[in-house]
């Protein structure tokens, strides 16, 4: 089974927006991560203002759908490119296949690789200029199949 979830990118007000969505849809955040929690990347420095911004946030709005988002960091979100689709596959092989097909004729912005947050993950923009985040997480699959584990696939912004 594949699952597609909306991913929203904000110009610094993600936390405010998601608190609003939480008031509308109810529920609790299953993940809130800030840029200050990322491993430091060589040649990249976070400003004090960026450290507290949202790297990733997740709000389940139904049994099947998780509203996800982040603040912009390395690119500027504009209306139109501030929404991406996050697809979680049920195997690493399917993640590779989906990523290859979606990025064909488009832009492979982050190749598929194992991430520090646990997902096998990549980002691309397809030939129709749609932003995609492709991931596979074995623990997330167990959760979807009824396991007691409370681990969620986490995606980062495009």
Q: Where do the language-model regions lie?
A:
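Core segments of cupin and vicinal oxygen chelate
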Residues: 8-63
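Extended amphipathic alpha-helical segments enriched in small hydrophobics
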Residues: 65-67
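Vicinal oxygen chelate
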Residues: 2, 30, 55-58, 69-71, ...
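Acidic/polar active-site rim loop that often engages polyanionic ligands
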Residues: 81
